Amino acid sequence: MLNIKWIRENQELFDEKLSQRFIEPMSSKIAMLDGEKRKITCLIQEFQHARKVKSKILGNMASKSGEEFEGLQRDVKHINEKLEELEQDLNNNNELNELLNMLPNIPDEEVPYGMDESMNKLVRTYGETNPNALNKQHFELGTKLNLMDFEQTAKISGARFVTLKGDLAKLERALINFMIDVHTKEFDFFEISPPVLVRDNAMYNAGQLPKFAEESFATTNGYRLIPTAEVSLVNIVADTIIPREKLPMRYVAYTPCFRSEAGSSGRDTRGMIRLHQFGKVELVSITTTEESKNEHEYITNASETILQKLNLPYRVMLLCTGDMGFAAKKTYDIEVWLPGQKQYREIASCSNCGDFQARRMKARYKEFGSNETTLVHTLNASGLPIGRTMVAILENYQNEDGSITIPDVLINYMGGLQKITTYSE
């Protein structure tokens, strides 16, 4: 959520930042609604003060009867009725909060202006892409190996699900353990095993609700399946005040993730690129205002390191204003090279959300000996999605005979297996 005080004091700049997100000016409407809310709040405070004064006089009166006493009683009763009416008006005046809840984060000054991914800025590349490399797509390779099943799985769960078998299931498990080990041992992230069912308020805190309600799966009894472990991890600090010396707090978690993929009809309908259920290792950092920028580079480096150790070619893109996620103020996308598609595809997003999520979930920190609190900054990064990493391995490590060479760093995690070959039932 955006800072209403900042909007109030920077209306022209606020509208300019909204225009960079291709949103019409909102400052005038917000100022009007904010003014109405503040007026009601001021009246409530005045009536509360008047009630306190009159109640004190009533309590100190020697005679609990008579015209003066009864008149004061009537005054207090009238004040209570008026307060109830005003508080009801305040509770019903949801338009301001509803409007603020639908507005995305303000872009950082370093974010390039642009409407879509074509305007993203190349930051760096890693590894070499070979235009003459073997170029079968991952789903061709997986099904030929008899270790990736879409057809039978569709009978069980419908489209956008997959069943992995044998050595591919083992590769999935190896990747999870490898990624967690790198992040905990080399980057000092603390491993968490969080719930994947959360309440709506947790989704709201993370910026998933109300705007993206249709993109998540909801149960019939008030829970939602997480679209990313970011939701569970950032909420660890909801409604807390953290001692400054404990920051940064860095969390890593592997979870299954669930997305309805609303609006993705016709996109990536084959294979494992876009599934309703997928596994992902997620990174979250909680830090201070001053360290936020450096922490963004740190968490991005952690994600990149996984691809470097797997020797997968990739590039890092700085997203433009029109391509950034809702809660982000600045985002790097990491795109891995897929020979089967002959293009780079997104494999990770690394975002600095500033105090946007923290304001929603009331997460603060304070210096030792101080009573003043400051909103934390939250950052998140994919570290990485297991399915898309497996896609990249299958396509970049494929052999002429359809077998898949295991990347060196995964051989021990695969129990010494160096190559995945066709499974014969």
From Swiss-Prot:
It is found in: Cytoplasm. It catalyses: tRNA(Ser) + L-serine + ATP = L-seryl-tRNA(Ser) + AMP + diphosphate + H(+); tRNA(Sec) + L-serine + ATP = L-seryl-tRNA(Sec) + AMP + diphosphate + H(+). InterPro entries: aa-tRNA-synt_IIb, aa-tRNA-synth_II, aa-tRNA-synth_II/BPL/LPL, Ser-tRNA-ligase_type_1, Ser-tRNA-synth_1_N, SerRS_1_N_sf, SerRS_core, tRNA-bd_arm. One of its GO terms (molecular function) is ATP binding. Keywords: Aminoacyl-tRNA synthetase, ATP-binding, Cytoplasm, Ligase, Nucleotide-binding, Protein biosynthesis. Pathway: Aminoacyl-tRNA biosynthesis; selenocysteinyl-tRNA(Sec) biosynthesis; L-seryl-tRNA(Sec) from L-serine and tRNA(Sec): step 1/1. Catalyzes the attachment of serine to tRNA(Ser). Is also able to aminoacylate tRNA(Sec) with serine, to form the misacylated tRNA L-seryl-tRNA(Sec), which will be further converted into selenocysteinyl-tRNA(Sec). Consists of two distinct domains, a catalytic core and a N-terminal extension that is involved in tRNA binding. Belongs to the class-II aminoacyl-tRNA synthetase family. Type-1 seryl-tRNA synthetase subfamily. Homodimer. The tRNA molecule binds across the dimer. This is Serine--tRNA ligase. It comes from Rickettsia felis (strain ATCC VR-1525 / URRWXCal2) (Rickettsia azadi).
